[in-house]
Amino acid sequence: MEKDDSILTNITLQTFASEGDVALVDKRWEKDGPAFLQRLFAAGLLSYEKGQIWNKDSKLMRFVIFKYGSPEALNRCLPIWKEVEKRMFENVVIKVTAYRGVSSEYVAAN
């Protein structure tokens, strides 16, 4: 086990109103996401992970996990995330719930 107090984690839950909203965001992300991620990684984002919530009876929920190495890295990324939200969620009905915290333990298989 490893403890690293410097890793900041953001867990975001996204709930879409329709499959059309999901498809629109996915299409936009496919087109513009790589350029946004390049900028975010340059600003200090350590990792990005997106997944489908499967223990709910809906294909309209997903999670996104972001990790940052420092508060400064997070602050450098926030303006870019504002651009991402504006571009990805324009004319989309979505509920976004975000939680930020400091990782207290991280375990990975060797």
Name each model-derived stretch.
Residues 8-17:
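Short glycine-/aliphatic-rich beta-strand segments at the starts of folded cytosolic domains
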Residues 4, 9, 33-36, 70:
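Terminal low-complexity, poorly structured segments
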Residues 15-16, 68, 81:
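Short beta-strand segments enriched in hydrophobic/aromatic residues
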Residues 20-48, 81-89:
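Short amphipathic alpha-helical segments
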Residues 75-78:
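A beta-strand edge to alpha-helix "cap/lid" segment located at domain peripheries
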Residues 19, 67-73:
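Helix N-cap motif at beta-to-alpha junctions
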Residues 1-8, 41-63, 85-110:
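Glycine-rich beta-strand-turn "strand-cap" elements at beta-sheet edges
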